[in-house]
A protein has these predicted regions:
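Active-site-adjacent loop/helix segments that line or gate small-molecule/cofactor pockets in enzymes
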Residues: 1-19
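Glycine-rich loop-to-alpha-helix module at the N-terminal edge of alpha/beta enzyme cores
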Residues: 32-114
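PLP-dependent aspartate aminotransferase-fold enzymes
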Residues: 78-186
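Generic structural signal for secondary-structure transition and capping sites
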Residues: 1-4, 61, 85, 185
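Condensing-enzyme catalytic core of the thiolase-fold
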Residues: 188-192
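Short glycine/serine/threonine-biased micro-segments
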Residues: 18-20, 37, 44, 94, ...
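Active-site and channel-lining beta-strand-loop segments
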Residues: 14-35
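Short beta-strand-to-turn element immediately C-terminal to the catalytic PLP-Schiff-base lysine
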Residues: 26, 45-46, 132-133
Length: 192
C-alpha cells in the first residue's frame, strides 16, 4: 500500500517528489536530484518545459479529457505512419502495460499460438504475461542456456501463463537462437 506504481517502490519507502524543473527533481525534504528516470523515458523534454506548459494550457482551454478521438490523435498517427514505413495502422493505448497486453493478444490471435518469448531482465509492463524474469531471484534463474520463467516478486502468476512464457538471456544471441528455434512453432511473438 501507499504507492501508485509498483515499479518505483523502494523499501522502506519510495522517493516522494515535490516538483521538477528541466532534468532536476526535488523531493518533499528539499533534496535535489538529477532525474535519470524521466518518467521511464517518456519525459524527453524534462520537467516543466515552457513550450510543453504552453501547449498543455492551450489544450486545457479547449477541454480536459475526452473519450473521443480528435485532430491531434489523427495527426500523430499520420506522422508515425509516415516516419515508419512498415507501420500501416496505429492503436493508441493508455499505458505501456496496456500496449504490450494488446500487442500480445493481437499476436496470439493472428498466429493462433500461445507462447511468447521475452528477454531475461526486460520490463514490459505490469500484467501476468510479462511480469516474468524481470529481476529474478538468482537462485531460481536456471542455466544461462535455458533460463527459467520466474514470476516477478513471487507474484501469483498462474502456472499456465508461466509455461507460455519462454525466457531468453539478454544480449546473448548465440544462446538465445537455439531457444527461439526450439520453440518457434509455438511462439506468437518475441517481446524485446
Amino acid at each position: 500500500g501507499g504507492d501508485t506504481r509498483t515499479t518505483v517502490y523502494q523499501s522502506p519507502h519510495p522517493l516522494y517528489a515535490d516538483h521538477g524543473k528541466g532534468c532536476r527533481l526535488y523531493d518533499v525534504d528539499g533534496n535535489e536530484y538529477i532525474d535519470f528516470v524521466n518518467n521511464h523515458t517518456s519525459m524527453i523534454h524534462g520537467h516543466a518545459h515552457p513550450k510543453i506548459i504552453g501547449a498543455v494550457q492551450q489544450q486545457l482551454e479547449k477541454g480536459t479529457a475526452w473519450t473521443a478521438y480528435n485532430e491531434h490523435t489523427i495527426r500523430l498517427a499520420q506522422i508515425i505512419c509516415e516516419r515508419v514505413p512498415s507501420v500501416e495502422k496505429i492503436r493508441f493505448c493508455n499505458s505501456g502495460t496496456e500496449a504490450t497486453m494488446m500487442a500480445l493478444r493481437a499476436a496470439r490471435a493472428h498466429t493462433g499460438r500461445s507462447k511468447i518469448i521475452k528477454t531475461e531482465g526486460g520490463y514490459h509492463g505490469s500484467h501476468d504475461a510479462v511480469e516474468i524474469s524481470i529481476i529474478p531471484d538468482p537462485r531460481l534463474l536456471g542455466p544461462i542456456e535455458s533460463p527459467a520463467s520466474v514470476p516477478e516478486g513471487g507474484a501469483a502468476i498462474p502456472k499456465g501463463v508461466l509455461s507460455d512464457v519462454v525466457v531468453i538471456p539478454f544480449n546473448e544471441p548465440d544462446l538465445a537462437e537455439p531457444i527461439i528455434r526450439r520453440n518457434a512453432s509455438e511462439v506468437a511473438a518475441i517481446i524485446v
